[in-house]
Regions:
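Active-site metal-coordination segments of metallo-dependent hydrolases
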Residues: 40-42, 136-140, 202-206
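A conditional alpha-helix N-cap/helix-loop micro-motif detector
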Residues: 87-91, 112-113, 139, 160-164, ...
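Non-catalytic C-terminal accessory region of glycerolipid acyltransferases
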Residues: 32, 50-53, 57, 61, ...
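Catalytic core of membrane glycerolipid acyltransferases/transacylases, capturing the structured
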Residues: 104-162, 191-194
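Short amphipathic alpha-helical segments and helix-helix/interface helices
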Residues: 94-98, 120-124, 143-147, 170-171, ...
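Conserved beta-strand termini and adjacent loop/short-helix elements that scaffold enzyme active sites
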Residues: 94, 133-135, 160, 242-244, ...
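Soluble or luminal CAZymes and related metallo-dependent hydrolases
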Residues: 4, 39, 89, 162, ...
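Membrane-anchoring hydrophobic helices of lipid-metabolizing enzymes
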Residues: 1-110, 143-148, 154, 308
Length: 308
């Protein structure tokens, strides 16, 4: 049996008071930030490319705190002691999003920011159905915990393995249904990613939201999730949602609509995210200048080969 620290945390944390778990997460921030390492340096570089400015030491520590808080909240969501997490959520633009889903699916592009599971739980608690995709992680028992957590909150989950496409399954699952389809899409370096302007640099993001909205001929919204009213024992969640996102009116004939729609939602997301960059949990390479060009070229060639 493979030991997973995260699996152990999932088993232990819900037995503890919410305030104890959140305070423990808060206390750990200083240690993690001081230790540094590649993920912290990548976080720093990504924040700089998003905003055009090097983050201060305090801002970087705040980013580490936000990242750890998100994990701590995920451990507690769905448990009786984590029930207060469903409160303290404000959702700007929810009425328009919900109205757009009345006559069919609406796609919602998200980034890895704030607490997306907490925001999703709030949406489900307010009477809307969510269908989304979750990447399969190891060990399988950990992925099963994540799925059980989200399904317990009212979401429908389609698991996807690395390198696998579930686009067709997702289309069939949501077609004709009054559902919201949130998709984390601010990174895709697999070869199928679309190159866009993200903040102050070029980045690779997922085609999924724009491709799904185009395939279904349904609206595409975009949201940025951040924290506010932060204390050592927790924080509120703020969701800013705008849409429907549309392609430029002067889009050239023959231009790729999915690419144009992707740039449109990314521009909206980046503008909102730049207001609170410490809540963007991007500790991986996403900007083109940070990628190995030869590896990226091979990935793109392989993607093209598979899709001939």
């Amino acid at each position: 049996v493979t030991f997973s620290p995260l699996s152990a945390a999932f088993a232990l944390a819900p037995r503890l008071p919410l305030g104890v778990v959140m305070r423990a997460a808060h206390v750990s921030v200083g240690l993690v930030a001081r230790r540094g390492g590649a993920p912290i340096e990548r976080l720093r570089a990504n924040m700089a490319r998003l905003t055009g400015e090097q983050p201060s030491r305090d801002l970087l520590v705040a980013a580490v705190r936000s990242h750890i808080r998100n994990y701590a909240e995920e451990l507690m969501l769905g448990s009786s002691r984590g029930a207060p997490l469903l409160e303290g959520v404000s959702f700007d633009g929810f009425e328009a999003l919900a109205a757009a889903s009345e006559d069919g699916p609406v796609v919602l592009a998200l980034g890895h920011s704030g607490s997306w599971d907490r925001a999703g739980a709030w949406v489900c608690a307010h009477g809307r159905v969510i269908v989304t995709v979750a990447e399969k992680v190891e060990p399988p028992s950990l992925f099963e915990r994540f799925v059980a957590l989200r399904e317990g909150l009212g979401m429908e989950i389609i698991g996807v393995a690395k390198g696998e496409s579930v686009f067709g399954s997702l289309v069939e699952r949501v077609r004709g249904r009054s559902v919201i389809v949130p998709l984390l899409a601010d990174r895709d370096i697999s070869g199928s990613g679309i190159e866009v302007d993200l903040g102050r640099a070029r980045a690779l993001v997922a085609a999924g939201p724009a491709a799904l909205a185009t395939k279904l001929d349904r609206p595409l919204f975009v949201a940025c999730i951040t924290y506010e009213n932060e204390t050592p024992t927790g924080a509120d969640v703020r969701v800013r949602c705008v849409g429907p996102v549309s392609v430029p009116k002067d889009l050239a004939p023959g231009a790729n609509r999915v690419e144009a729609l992707t740039q449109a939602w990314v521009s909206e997301f980046a503008a909102m995210m730049a207001d609170k960059p410490q809540d963007w949990h991007m500790m991986q390479r996403v900007f083109v200048e940070d990628l190995d060009p030869e590896r990226l070229a091979r990935a793109r060639a392989e993607h093209e080969r598979k899709n001939r």
